[in-house]
């Protein structure tokens, strides 16, 4: 029979006390920290699972933040496109109002000031930033999407022809320079007394140029250096129909222009006005300011002003007094076509930006150019140019509407992704909590049991120690 000595009993009881004390430490630590697994040694398998859950939660948090930032970018982008849409709608209303012949040059120049502000507001919308980063520049987020930098428009005041709004026939009309040396630069009207007879009148001088001419569809109508061709489309003109030819240069000199100092460019319309065959003035039409007067003209020489270099070259006829040449810097896209992708799941991404060249300057219409064309047409009192502008605005509004719809669909998708990530985070957190977090009711019960067991073990140990000591003293 195995005999257990007093010392062995004491050692067993002491080991039991130490085990209970270790368990008490773990339970008290779990109650204090709220975690029942605090180190790998507590539960190695559970600790490994907890670390995996933490990594998953970190990835979810990063993706949720990226999705949230993407939604913010797209929401602001949608707002900017909406602002642009409102601007273009107003610009179209102005173009429709000013296309008629009832507005005076002064009235058109006055309304051009509003158009200029619309242009600047449109540029601001296209150059919207979030967190100091441009929204519509692709990957080039530190570069403004649109700026005056490299493109300049330049043209002489060439003749153009337009049908009166109240014409009842359907006739196409073109005008070109036939003999530059015979040009007067004046305004003309071709008026039909019936479907086969017309007169040509110089509206500037009041003189009749051609009288009782017989109309033939597609035939040349030549006068004062101009050639007009009227063509049935599909029917011909009717009595009372009228076609007007705008004032134009009396020469066929041409102009080109380029940027000389980009930092000096302003979004203005400039006019080079010839006061004689050898001298010209330069006027800022936008601000109605004369930049210089009495400049000496030499064919092919550089004309430098406001960051622009213009060159006028003689044709068969040198520029004449009254000839006008218009110059303006144009806005152009400065970004790239980069798509900023956001990963919402392993290997799956969604674009979080829209490219300005596919919203404001394309894919169908360059709306900044259309706004500049509207302003120039009003400043130069050429309502015949407004029909093209109106058509561009109509197409451009569809372009902006399509862009808003595309952005809206992306925002909706991001909202759904955010909801999915939130749900995944909650589910993962619950699973982690089941393994890691303290069950306070269970732990409190364990604490009470262990404390009772400890007291009992200590009492037993004490008694056994007393017995051992008494036996020793005997």
Region locations from a protein language model:
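Amphipathic alpha-helical polymerization modules
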Residues: 1-147, 151, 372-474
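Alpha-helix initiation/capping motif
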Residues: 5, 43, 148, 162-165, ...
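Short solvent-exposed loop/turn micro-motifs enriched in small/polar/acidic residues
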Residues: 22, 183, 265, 333-336
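Polar, low-complexity export/assembly segments characteristic of proteins
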Residues: 24, 28-31, 35, 130, ...
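Aromatic side chains
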Residues: 63, 134-136, 188, 198, ...
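Intrinsically disordered, low-complexity regulatory segments in eukaryotic proteins
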Residues: 147, 153-160
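Extended, beta-strand-rich, solvent-exposed assembly scaffolds of outer structural proteins
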Residues: 157-329
């Amino acid at each position: 029979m195995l005999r257990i000595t007093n010392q062995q009993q004491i050692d067993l009881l002491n080991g039991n006390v130490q085990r209970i004390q270790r368990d008490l430490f773990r339970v008290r630590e779990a109650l204090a920290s709220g975690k029942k697994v605090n180190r790998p040694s507590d539960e190695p398998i559970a600790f490994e699972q907890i670390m995996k859950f933490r990594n998953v939660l970190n990835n979810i948090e990063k993706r949720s933040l990226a999705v949230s930032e993407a939604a913010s970018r797209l929401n602001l982008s949608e707002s900017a496109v909406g602002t642009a849409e409102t601007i273009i709608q107003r610009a179209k209303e102005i173009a429709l109002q000013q296309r008629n012949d009832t507005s005076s040059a002064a009235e058109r120049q006055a309304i051009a000031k509003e158009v200029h502000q619309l242009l600047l507001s449109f540029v601001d919308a296209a150059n919207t930033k979030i967190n100091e980063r441009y929204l519509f520049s692709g990957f080039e987020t530190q570069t403004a999407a649109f700026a005056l930098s490299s493109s300049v428009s330049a043209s002489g005041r060439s003749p153009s022809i337009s049908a009166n709004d109240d014409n009842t026939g359907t006739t196409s009309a073109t005008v070109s320079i036939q003999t530059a040396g015979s040009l007067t630069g004046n305004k003309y009207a071709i008026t039909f007394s019936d479907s086969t007879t017309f007169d040509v009148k110089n509206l500037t001088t009041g003189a009749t140029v051609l009288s009782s001419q017989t109309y033939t569809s597609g035939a040349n109508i030549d006068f004062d250096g101009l050639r007009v061709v009227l063509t049935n489309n599909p029917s011909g003109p009717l009595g009372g129909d009228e076609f007007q030819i705008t004032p134009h240069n009396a020469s066929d000199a041409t102009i080109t222009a380029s940027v000389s100092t980009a930092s000096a460019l302003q979004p203005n319309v400039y006019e080079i006005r010839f006061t004689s065959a050898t001298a010209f003035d330069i006027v800022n039409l936008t601000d109605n300011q004369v930049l210089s007067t009495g400049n000496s003209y030499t064919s092919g020489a550089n004309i430098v002003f406001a960051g622009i270099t213009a060159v006028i070259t003689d044709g068969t006829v040198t520029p004449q007094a009254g000839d006008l040449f218009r110059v303006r810097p144009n806005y152009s896209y400065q970004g790239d076509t980069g798509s900023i992708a956001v990963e919402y799941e392993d290997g799956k991404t969604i674009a979080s930006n829209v490219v300005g060249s596919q919203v404001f300057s394309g894919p169908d219409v360059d709306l900044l150019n259309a706004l500049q064309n509207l302003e120039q047409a009003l400043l130069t009192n050429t309502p015949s140019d407004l029909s093209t502008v109106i058509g561009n605005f109509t197409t451009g509004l569809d372009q902006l509407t399509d862009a808003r719809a595309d952005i809206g669909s992306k925002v909706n998708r991001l909202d759904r992704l955010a909801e999915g990530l939130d749900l995944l985070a909650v589910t993962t957190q619950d699973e982690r909590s089941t393994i890691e977090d303290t069950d306070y009711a269970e732990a409190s019960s364990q604490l009470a049991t262990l404390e009772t067991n400890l007291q009992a073990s200590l009492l037993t140990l004490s008694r056994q120690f007393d017995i051992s000591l008494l036996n020793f003293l005997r």
